[in-house]
A protein has these predicted regions:
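Catalytic cores of DNA base-excision repair glycosylases
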Residues: 24-242, 248
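Polybasic, lysine-enriched low-complexity intrinsically disordered terminal tails
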Residues: 1-23, 233-253
Length: 253
C-alpha cells in the first residue's frame, strides 16, 4: 500500500486510525478556526465527572480508567457526600471505599491506590492536592493523563490529557496527528493557540465522545467537517419511511 493511501485509509469501511505525515496536519489558520467553532457551540466546556473539590476530582479521575464517566458518577455520588478530604478517605478505610465503588471496573486496585494516595496527601501535602505534575505523578495510581486532567480542570493549567477520544480526534481530523499518546499531547501543546489552550482538552474529548465517534463519526452534524482531513465524510442515516396501514376493504353486503 502506498504512503498516500495508508494515511487516507480511515474511511467508513476501515476504522483503523493511521498516522499522518506533515501533509495530513491542519494548517495554523484551520486549527484556530477548528477551536473557534467548538468554542462557539460550547463556550464553557466542563468535565462530565461529578466532583466538589480538587481532591474529589483526583479520586474521580483515578477511578475513571476503563470506566465511563456515568458509571463513576453513580459510584461516587454517595461516596462524595460522605468523603470530601483525604483524611476522611483514610478514616473510611479500604473496605469502606470498596463498598462504594464496587460497581466500577478494577475497583480493588483503584481502591488501594485511592487510599494510598490519600495517606500521602495527608502526610506530605497537608491534605491538599498539589498543582505540580511531578508531585501528582508520584501518587499511587496517578499517571500523566490523570495529572494533566487534574492540573487542567482543578487549577486551570494549559495541559492536554490525551485519552482514546482525543487520540482519535487528533489523528482523524489532522489537528494533532501522532503515533503515540505522548506525540499527540506534544502536538496539541505546540499547535493549540490562545485563547483555546485551557478549554482544548474538554472540547476535544466531548467532540470525540458525541460527534467524532470511533465506529461511525457523525460528519453530517459536525461543525468542523469542512476543516477535517477525514474522507469520505459519513452521510446521515437514512430515515425509514413509515408504513401506513389501512383497514381492509369489507365486501359489500
Amino acid at each position: 500500500r502506498s504512503g498516500k493511501s495508508r494515511y487516507l485509509a480511515d474511511t467508513p469501511k476501515s476504522r483503523s486510525v493511521h498516522y499522518a505525515r506533515s501533509a495530513w496536519s491542519l494548517k495554523k489558520a484551520d486549527i484556530f478556526e477548528f477551536y473557534r467553532r467548538l468554542a462557539e457551540e460550547n463556550p464553557a466546556p466542563e468535565t462530565e465527572l461529578a466532583y466538589g473539590n480538587a481532591y474529589q476530582l483526583l479520586v474521580a479521575v483515578t477511578c475513571s480508567a476503563q470506566s465511563t464517566d456515568v458509571g463513576v458518577n453513580k459510584a461516587t455520588k454517595a461516596l462524595f457526600a460522605e468523603v470530601k478530604t483525604p483524611a476522611q478517605m483514610v478514616a473510611l478505610g479500604l473496605e469502606g471505599l470498596k463498598a462504594h465503588i464496587k460497581t466500577i471496573g478494577l475497583f480493588n486496585n483503584k481502591a488501594k491506590n485511592v487510599i494510598a494516595l490519600s495517606e500521602i496527601l495527608v502526610r506530605d501535602h497537608a491534605g491538599e492536592v498539589p498543582a505540580d505534575r511531578d508531585a501528582l505523578e508520584a501518587l499511587p495510581g496517578v499517571g500523566r493523563k490523570t495529572a494533566n486532567v487534574v492540573m487542567n480542570t482543578a487549577f486551570g493549567a494549559e495541559t492536554f490529557a490525551v485519552d482514546t477520544h482525543i487520540f482519535r480526534v487528533g489523528n482523524r481530523t489532522g489537528i494533532a496527528p501522532g503515533k503515540t499518546v505522548l506525540a499527540v499531547e506534544k502536538a496539541l501543546d505546540k499547535k493549540t493557540p490562545q485563547p483555546f489552550r485551557v478549554g482544548a482538552h474538554h472540547w476535544l474529548i466531548l467532540h470525540g465522545r458525541y460527534i467524532c465517534k470511533a465506529r461511525t463519526p457523525e460528519c453530517w452534524r459536525c461543525p468542523v467537517a469542512d476543516l477535517c482531513r477525514f474522507k469520505p465524510k459519513t452521510a446521515p442515516p437514512k430515515i425509514k419511511s413509515a408504513t401506513v396501514q389501512t383497514d381492509p376493504v369489507k365486501p359489500a353486503a
